[in-house]
């Protein structure tokens, strides 16, 4: 596990975008695993600028998002589909047919999960997976549990997650209580992983991810077993290491 600590969020975002750019330049048809939330926003802004400056071509890449709220229409402005379109896809030359985000309103949700998993396998897995981390140590929407859920699945969201995500909604009651998420095995099968974290509220989860025992109660701790994972942190998130 490689740990990079930066003085602030801007420097963290620059490093993350540099890794993504290098991946796409070295393999133009890369399969990228993408994350949402506030942490990757700076990285996405940098990628848009790189595209506008003609430093990068996204036309051949494929993307798979980690998760999506269950029961939320993709047209809802809090859906992760909406987030990705607004914060990245509408501003780069990606082929819309190469964008993959779980369908939270699929009529057969279990089939949606297995189809999503199969599609990732059909592309020979993810080349570079981008992760954030929850204050409870979740990655994707793999919440603290008694076991590691292997493949794409429906999950009931942890109270801490609902509370944390309520800042994006008018009230806590509006936050969906379930989501579709890539599983731990799916994430761990990525050839390379970068995890981004900023802020003191993430310091405890980062400490347990790096120094704790491998424990499904801290889902990110499983990353200790991956052979190419880099944690990209600001000094606050790294403050307990």
UniProtKB/Swiss-Prot annotation:
EC supergroup of this enzyme: hydrolase
BP term (GO), one: carbohydrate metabolic process
InterPro entries: Glc/Gal-6P_isomerase, Glucosamine6P_isomerase, Glucosamine6P_isomerase_CS, NagB/RpiA_transferase-like
UniProt-listed Enzyme Commission number(s): 3.5.99.6
Keywords: Carbohydrate metabolism, Hydrolase
An example molecular function term from Gene Ontology annotations: glucosamine-6-phosphate deaminase activity
Catalytic reaction list: alpha-D-glucosamine 6-phosphate + H2O = beta-D-fructose 6-phosphate + NH4(+)
Annotated active site: 67, 136, 138, 143
Pathway assigned in UniProt: Amino-sugar metabolism; N-acetylneuraminate degradation; D-fructose 6-phosphate from N-acetylneuraminate: step 5/5
Record flagged with keyword Hydrolase: yes
A cellular component annotation (GO) from this entry: cytoplasm
Stored PROSITE patterns: GLC_GALNAC_ISOMERASE
Pfam annotation, one family: Glucosamine_iso
NCBIfam families: nagB, PRK00443.1-4
Record function comment: Catalyzes the reversible isomerization-deamination of glucosamine 6-phosphate (GlcN6P) to form fructose 6-phosphate (Fru6P) and ammonium ion.
PANTHER family xref list: GLUCOSAMINE-6-PHOSPHATE ISOMERASE (PTHR11280:SF5)
Family affiliation: Belongs to the glucosamine/galactosamine-6-phosphate isomerase family. NagB subfamily.
Name recorded for this polypeptide: Glucosamine-6-phosphate deaminase
Organism: Clostridium novyi (strain NT)
Record lineage: Bacteria, Bacillati, Bacillota, Clostridia, Eubacteriales
